[in-house]
């Protein structure tokens, strides 16, 4: 792959993955970027729907092995849109290979997994970001305010 493109690998082929891919497609058209976005590989568990998603979404290839996607030299960044149990291991592996990761929320199943992801990013010097796409939605902002003011009483979680 030439230096004119950023190769993206996406883990998962559900609705949130499709939202990420739509945003990635848009990046090539909304502004003059120094590099274009190239959809290299999409990964998941089941071959038949994965192959259909790859074709529909415009990926060059697909794989049922997250290891293969993370190890692919044409994949420069990884968007991890798998279910929660698929967040930590692939993200840590990608970060360990120096590939930035955008992982859907929550980062891990517990604080230890999230910390391991953070440590992998720190050690490799690349970004591990979490998709907090609802953070500034008015309803969420209002809920935070109501909880913060104690208007709902003493909450437990």
Where are the model-predicted features located?
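N-terminal Rossmann-like dinucleotide-binding module
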Residues: 1-57
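Nucleotide donor/acceptor-binding cores
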Residues: 4-6, 126, 155-156
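Hydrophobic Val/Ile/Leu positions in short beta-strands of Rossmann-like dinucleotide-binding domains
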Residues: 8-10, 80, 103
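Predominantly a Rossmann-like dinucleotide-binding segment in NAD(P)-dependent oxidoreductases
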Residues: 16, 134-157
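Conserved acidic residues
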Residues: 40, 60, 74-76, 156
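Conserved SAM-binding strand-loop segment of SAM-dependent methyltransferases
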Residues: 60-66
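Beta-strand-loop-alpha-helix segment that lines the small-molecule cofactor/substrate pocket
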Residues: 77, 84, 88-135, 150
